[in-house]
Amino acid sequence: ITFLVGGGVGPSPAASGRWGGRMLVTHRRPDGVYERFTSDAPAGAVRFDTARADVTIGRSTVRQRNGVYALDVHAAGNAGEARLELEVQPLRHRYFPPVELRDDDFLSGYVVPGLAASASGRLCVRARCGRVTDVAAYHDHNWGVWRDVTWEWGAARGQELSLLYGGVYGPERARGEGAVNSPFFLSLVDSLGVRQVLRFDRIAYEGEAPAAGASGAIAPRRFTLAGTRGRDSVALAVEVEHAVATDMSAASFRRLFFQMRGRFTLRGRIGGAEVSDSGQGFFETYRTR
């Protein structure tokens, strides 16, 4: 579920003004088919505040009170109109503080108020409704410049630890130009908060598997990375269980955007103690055409 505010939103940005808002809901059915629901709003129907998390985009709203996010979402797609009424409750101390990521001439910001959270409420498509109770959820905020930008990202939840990794490439890095040492971070979070933030410089993708979405798209079957900081080090391995690809067009290059679900294992040493965990997560990457 995405509340998006930005420039040139909608099929005809010039006709609707310089900026606006979009609601985006993506639903994966039990048969593996993805359904997409959207709703665009002009600038006059958008409300947001840099001092709080409340956002209004047309008929859709999110309100944060006492740490709980209340979502009321309206969007439409080929399957009909979607309506969501949800409450998202982040788990205590399971967050990642705000950071701003720089690469040459662009700046992008990121914060994760709900690295691990639970969601409850009602979801409807047309006249069919269902309820969810205390299902696993995640919530983040992004801001800044994202034109011609690519990234590596992942968030996962184990028995003891939550993890988050990422890094952003500007247009030059996305085309394979330039060099940056250890451009990625890996954050490990437990019930007391951030336990360690490590650095790594590459992700090793292996194998091939068909992806849903874009025709002919091939996703990685697995990947690994190794993060270090001082004497601390961990190894993360992910087996991809499902992937969907979106064909993206940019001013300077063509690319495929992959959203993947999979299982992870984590092993290493933090603060002189062994760590080991496993669980499920969601991961994103790009591949050029």
Feature locations, PLM:
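Structured soluble/peripheral alpha/beta segments that form catalytic or ligand/cofactor-binding pockets
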Residues: 1-289
